[in-house]
Every structure is written in C-alpha cells, then in structure tokens.
C-alpha cells in the first residue's frame, strides 16, 4: 500500500542563512543520500552531546579512511537511462548477500578525494551517443582522466561498460576509464566487460565472475557479520509491475496533435494505470515494450521465404517464427552482428568490406541509414529460421519522457508525446517499433508498460526557484509535466519555456495549452523557434543567445535549467549556446564557462533528458 505522508518538520534551530544553505546543499539528492546524511548528522550530534541511547552508532569518521576502504567494495555507477544503475544495484545486493561490506554510489556523488584511499572499486558506466559519459558521471570521468587524478598502486578495480554497438564509439567511456585506471597504477581484478543493448546476460555473467574475485580478495564473512560503511538505499516496497513484469495499460486517448498538412505524425497518448500500483513523478520515463508492425513481419517472411508458423526453440522457449519476429526480436534496427552474419551468408564482398576496422565511418552510416529489411531485399540470403532468431537482438523496451504530472491528472493515468517513425527509404517503408505500435494502439489495446525513475531530472524542491525548460519537438513532453506540477503545487517561481519545431501552423505541439498557461500565469515566458517558416532556419539555441542577458541573470539568481530531446545535435548545440551566453553576458573565459556549467550539472541545476 502506497501512502503519501506529509513530513512534519521540527522548528528549525538554524538561522535563515544556514537554513537556505542546507536547502541548497541537499537539493536534488536521492533518498539514499538523504538517509545517509540523516544518520551521519545524528551520529555527529551523539558524539558532540553524548545523547543517551546513541551508543555504538557507526559513522564514516569513526575509523581511518584507509582501514575502511580496505574492508569494503565500492560500486560506482554512471547511468543516463537507468540500465547501469540497475546493474550496479543488483551487483550490490549480491555482494551484500555474499557477506561483503558494500558502498553503492552514483558517480556524481562519489567523493573524489577518497579515490586515493580506495582499495576495491567496481565501476558500471554507459556510453552515450558519440562516446560521451552520462551527465551525472562527467565530473567523475574527467577527474580520473585529468592531471589531478592520484596514483593508485593499491587499488584493485573492475569496469563494466554498457553501450550500443551500432555506434562507432561503442563503450568508449568504459574503455577509456579502464585504461586510465590501469595507467594510474591500479590492478584489474576482473577484465573489462562490455554489454550491448541487450545487456542482461553479459552483465549478469560479468557481475558473477567479478563478485567471486572480490569475495576472495576481501575474505568475505557470513552475511550476518556484514557492517556497511554507509547505507545502500532506503527501504521501499517493490512494485508489483516492473521492467520484467510490465503492466498492460489500457489506452484512454490516442490523438494526432499536428495538423493534417504536416508530413510528420506526433501523438498525444493517455494510458490508464488504474489498479497497477505504479507510481511516477514529473521527470520520470515510461518504459514501453513494443511489438513490431505486422506488415513488417510479413515482409520479412516473404523476403526470406520462411513459414511464420514454423516453431523455433530459443532461450528455453518454443514459439512460432512469426511470434519471434513480432514480439521477441528487434527487426527495425540494423546491428553490426546481424550485418556480419548476413555478409557471411551472402559472401558479398561489399558487405564484408564495410565491416573492416578502417571502415568505421562507413559502417556507422550504413547502420544509421538502413533497416534490416533493406539488407534482406538487396542482398538475398538463405536464412535458416533457428539461426535467424539466434542472430537477431532480443527486443528491448523504449523509454518515453512522461508528459503529465500525477498531481494534476491523477495517479491512475500517464500521458506520452510520441513522434511516429514511418518513412520511405531504399525502396522500403522504415518503421519505429515502439512509435508504430503506439500509433496503432486503439481503445481495445493493452500496452505493456513500467515506470523508469529519473531522479536526476526533477523539479527543484524549493517551489520559489525559477525554472528554464528547453524542449524542441517531442522534447516538450517532460515540460508539459513540469508546468502541470508547478501549477498543481502552487510553486511561486517563474517558468520559462523554449520550444522549437518545423512550422508554427503545423507542428506547434500543445499550442492551446501553452497559450492558456501564459494567460493563467502558469507559464511566464515562451520563446519559439520554427525552422522552416522562413528562408533562414531558426533553432532554439539561437533564441538562447538572443535572450542571453536575461537567461544568464536567471541562472545567476538560482534558476534550474532543463534540456530534453535529441542528444546527437540539439543538446550539444544548446550546450555550446550556454557557454556563449556565459562568456558574453558573464564575462567568463572559455575555461571558466565550462567550469560554471559543470558546476551547475553537479549541483543538479542543469539537467538533461536526451536520447
């Protein structure tokens, strides 16, 4: 049973200035970190005043750092979408059960000054887009890569990287981190692990092997003797429905929200969570398990001359081939392993050549521009049904930024903003698995969903803080939720939205809602950039520069800034625009501007939900 309790706060013993400082320092922290601070503060108070009943309380300061570090396994994760965090949490739980003293931290919360005393360290980290670290891990990665990193001759470490092999810089962050730690004198106690999009099997096997080595190194005792240096996480009820057990959500509404003249299809979709037990907050994502378009499954069977009713056994399950292609395997994404298998079957020299190490750019371009159906038609091959299922990547869920606040629409429904992927290329119709599935979902459909928390993309706890939101295209989704939340909670801070798309008359998503929000005071500023309405294209980053003086003033006064949308181009262009704003209107040097933005990221005042 989930019961929302309003905390009863004691009369503050701090002055206004110290109270404000405390609010700034704790803003954006995860529940586990707040619990730790609470225990730490209580322990300090006990030691200072010797309050009766506070005997035997363990605090981090009660033993020398090297001694504590030698007795524990530190697990640090850097996660953008939650996968690395999930793997790290599972590893921490297994290590705890095995009798190890464990410290689990997100990379952004890791105390870098303690790295020199660390003895046993595991890092689980993902690589984003063009080999970039997750936002919350930038400081951690840059410190280890930089000149201030200490020599680490006493450290034993292991690194697991999560990535997507369709990108040229697959697992680049973990590879660089692994090499750098070794260069600093540290010793691997497990080889570098690399897990593709279907990461579960690799991550599980790597974790088991790494944990066994760690147990031997730390001489793990029985679980009953475990003593943690710091709490792993707050105790919370496990939801009935999760990634592995999604809830079949009924469709309440599925509405096209671009004009009939638009060459794009964007949907506003409302789903019912009634009876699911799922709870979310503004800023979270909804995981959707998609189904491939039936027409595409038929095209595959036709191109391969295979029978959809033929049963195939894989992963302990025996299913018809059509079911494997429809629900269990990725058939809209061309991957390097599938391309390699197909090239071997066809014996085609051109396909084999693009897989050579010096052809990384050509391979990346091919994987980006083609879908598997193009390959099957252009380079026919005699695929066996069993080998085909084995070669295809397992289906993975897609994450959509939630476009509603439960405080306004209620806890029993959730809204999405979905850009439908469907276009012609190479003589075929290219589909997006999840977006096509959602676009076709009618009143009788059940959409398998789960909640993916995004703790680093939260509104400020202090409702008087100003908020700046940058969300072109479907990146507008979480900011619809943010404005709803601010409206429902009566937040007094100002809200400034930057939105961009192609055409004002065709693609102004939620136009009526934003106009009403402006009139009603829920939105204080709205700056728009429509790229195709004039000869010279206008984008949101230009609006940032044009409003740079006021934008910088808001940030200097404590505003929180959020970015959502395309990671490949938009997010990087926006970041560059923010650097320009800091240099132009703050008088900062290039290095100081970078340091300023890095500090905002570290403080949680600059947050990105990019994909």
For the regions a protein language model found, what residue spans apply to each?
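FNR-like FAD-binding dehydrogenase module
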Residues: 1-611
């Amino acid at each position: 049973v989930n019961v929302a309790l309003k905390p009863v706060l004691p009369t503050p013993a701090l002055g206004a200035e110290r109270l404000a400082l405390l609010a700034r320092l704790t803003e954006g922290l995860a529940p586990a970190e707040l619990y730790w601070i609470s225990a730490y503060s209580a322990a300090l108070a006990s030691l200072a005043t010797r309050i009766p009943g506070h005997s035997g309380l363990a605090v981090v300061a009660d033993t020398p750092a090297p001694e504590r570090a030698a007795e524990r396994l530190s697990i640090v994760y850097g996660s953008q979408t939650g996968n690395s965090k999930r793997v790290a949490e599972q590893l921490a739980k297994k290590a705890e059960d095995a009798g190890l003293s464990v410290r689990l931290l997100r990379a952004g919360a890791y105390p870098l000054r303690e790295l020199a005393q660390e003895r046993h360290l595991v890092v689980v980290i993902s690589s984003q887009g063009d080999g970039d670290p997750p936002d919350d891990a930038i400081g951690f990665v840059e410190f280890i890569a930089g000149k201030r990193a200490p020599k680490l001759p006493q450290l034993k470490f292991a690194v697991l990287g999560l990535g997507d092999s369709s990108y040229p810089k697959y697992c680049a962050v973990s590879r660089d981190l692994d090499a750098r730690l070794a260069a600093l004198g540290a010793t691997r106690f497990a080889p570098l692990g690399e897990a593709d999009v279907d990461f579960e099997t690799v991550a599980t096997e790597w974790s088991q092997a790494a944990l066994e080595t760690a147990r031997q190194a730390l001489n793990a005792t029985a679980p009953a003797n475990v003593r943690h240096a710091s709490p792993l996480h707050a105790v919370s009820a496990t939801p009935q429905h999760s990634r592995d057990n999604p809830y079949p959500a009924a469709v309440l509404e599925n509405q096209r929200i671009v004009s009939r003249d638009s060459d794009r299809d964007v949907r506003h979709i409302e789903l019912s969570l009634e009876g699911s037990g799922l709870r979310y907050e503004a800023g979270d994502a909804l995981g959707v398990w998609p189904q491939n378009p039936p027409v595409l499954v038929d095209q595959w069977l036709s191109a391969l001359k295979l029978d959809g009713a033929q049963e195939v056994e894989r992963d302990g399950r025996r299913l018809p081939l059509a079911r494997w292609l429809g629900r269990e395997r990725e058939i809209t994404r061309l991957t390097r392993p599938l391309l390699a298998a197909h090239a071997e079957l066809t014996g085609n020299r051109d396909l084999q050549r693009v897989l050579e190490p010096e052809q990384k750019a050509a391979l990346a371009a091919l994987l980006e521009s083609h879908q598997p159906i193009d390959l099957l038609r252009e380079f026919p091959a005699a695929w066996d049904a069993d080998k085909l299922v084995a070669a295809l990547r397992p289906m993975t869920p897609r994450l959509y930024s939630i476009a509603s606040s439960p405080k306004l629409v209620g806890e029993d429904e959730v809204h999405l903003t979905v850009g439908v992927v469907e276009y012609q290329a190479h003589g075929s119709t290219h589909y997006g698995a999840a977006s096509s599935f959602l676009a076709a979902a009618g009143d009788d459909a059940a959409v398998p969903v789960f909640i993916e928390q995004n703790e680093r993309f939260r509104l400020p706890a202090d409702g008087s803080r100003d908020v700046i939101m940058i969300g072109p295209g479907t990146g507008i989704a979480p900011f619809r939720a943010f404005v709803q939340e601010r409206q429902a909670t009566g937040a007094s801070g100002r809200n400034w939205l930057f939105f961009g798309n192609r055409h004002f008359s065709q693609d102004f998503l939620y136009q009526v809602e934003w106009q009403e929000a402006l009139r009603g005071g829920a939105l204080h500023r709205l700056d728009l950039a429509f790229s195709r309405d004039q000869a010279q294209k206008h984008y949101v980053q230009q609006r940032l520069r044009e409003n740079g003086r006021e934008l910088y003033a808001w940030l200097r006064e404590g505003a929180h800034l959020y970015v959502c949308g395309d990671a490949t181009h938009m997010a990087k262009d926006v970041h560059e625009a923010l650097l320009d704003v800091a240099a132009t209107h703050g008088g900062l040097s290039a290095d100081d501007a970078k340091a300023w933005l890095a500090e905002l990221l570290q403080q949680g005042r600059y947050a990105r939900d990019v994909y």
